[in-house]
């Protein structure tokens, strides 16, 4: 199942399961997740952000690229990158 299809089914009861499914897609999900992070709100945005953090290092370069293109997105990208890089140390 694709990222968009999973996110369409998202609710409070299945968010953990769907997040796990998104993360299992790995780096192939990152471009769509970054686009969704910039356009979504609420529960979807939270699941997208956590998915990017859990995917980890494969998210970093595309987060940086998106931040360079969209100045309003910079703080979000910086936060997620810090979370990803901080989890490598732990």
Task: Give residue ranges: language-model regions.
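A generic short-segment signal for beta-strand/edge and adjacent turn/coil regions
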Residues: 1-3, 16, 33
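Core helices of alpha-solenoid repeat scaffolds
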Residues: 3, 29-30, 60
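Structural detector for internal amphipathic alpha-helices that build alpha-solenoid repeat scaffolds
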Residues: 8-27, 35, 43-58, 65-68, ...
């Amino acid at each position: 199942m694709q990222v968009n299809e999973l996110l369409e089914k998202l609710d409070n009861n299945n968010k953990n399961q769907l997040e796990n499914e998104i993360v299992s897609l790995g780096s192939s999900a990152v471009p769509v997740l970054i686009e969704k992070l910039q356009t979504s709100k609420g529960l979807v945005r939270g699941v997208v952000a956590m998915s990017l953090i859990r995917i980890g290092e494969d998210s970093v370069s595309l987060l940086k690229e998106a931040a360079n293109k969209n100045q309003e997105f910079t703080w979000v990208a910086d936060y997620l990158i810090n979370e990803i890089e901080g989890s490598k140390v732990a």
